[in-house]
Structure formats: C-alpha cells, structure tokens
Amino acid sequence: MSFAVTPAELLSTFGLTGVVHFPRYESPDNRLDTRTADFLSQVGLPHDETFNSKASAGQEESILLTEWFAPDDGILPEECHPWLVLGYFAASVISLDPHTGKVYAFGEGEPLNTYTQLHRDVESLVHALNLFKKFREHQSDAQVGIDEQVEDLRARIHAFDVIPFEDDQSPWNLVLDEVIEGIW
C-alpha cells in the first residue's frame, strides 16, 4: 500500500525520536480500518512540539476518548464513544474514528458537542503536519513574505485535503493565522 508520506520522508523530517509507530495485529479488539492501521504501523505519527502524540513512550493516560474528558467537561456525544485519542494539536484534542478513519478536533474549553472534522484520515493529518514542519524549518530562508509563504502552505495542504480549512475556526486556520501574526 502506498501513502502520500513515506516512512523515510517522515523520519527525515521528524527524526528517529519524532515518529511513533503502532504495531499491526489482528484481533477482535482491533477496531481500526485497514488503511489507517497500515498507515500507523508503516509510516507512523509525528511527535514533536506541534503535534504531541498520545502513544509515545511514557504516556500513562488512556487513548480512549470516553476516558479522556472529566464530567465537568460535559457529555461526550454518543457517536464519539468508540473514538481514540491521537494527540494534541493547536489547543485541541485530536481523535480518530476507528471505523471510518476520519480525524476530529475537540477544542480546549469548547463544549464537547462542538467537535469538528479536522482531516479526512490519518494520512492527511500526517501529510499536513509534515508540510508544516518543513515550512517552519525553512520559512526564514525564503525571500517571499510570510503571507505568501502561508498561502502557499495552505494551498498545498488544501490540494490534498480540503477539510482542514472548511471552518474558519479550525485548528489549521488558527495556527496559520498565528504564523502570520508572528506567534509561531
């Protein structure tokens, strides 16, 4: 199976300690769709200051979304109960619907029923994170203004997956606005 981001490319961008792989196994409890499971075992998830994977070594919190939020956070919608936590990105808990492979964001401090779809799948999430990491490493090298650089990055992410920019308040729109404002 081929993916938009190769294992070698992800390792080159994030380094040996910046990629988390998941073992691929067959069992009745393995609820991941095949493409997602293959991607996570072959390519992996980044783990750095931008995206903090919950599956990295030493993580003691559960990856089950139902165990993630406290009662004070509100009631988790029923459709979200089987979802898994992938990590943190832009003040949001990032979760995975294991049946569809879709990736969702729960904004920090937001009502739980206001979650939004962030990416069509894990591959798209990792593709965008990979592009963002490369952008951050080279943004000061470019002769073009920051606005143009951000728009180029937005177009490259959008060409692969339109979902990250459908909502004006999506984590990706907020992050790229912060880059333009000089916060990142």
Where do the PLM segments sit?
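A surface-exposed partner-binding patch
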Residues: 1-100, 158-184
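Compact, glycine/acidic-enriched structural inserts
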Residues: 105-141
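Soluble C-terminal extramembrane regulatory/interaction domains of multi-pass membrane proteins
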Residues: 142-147
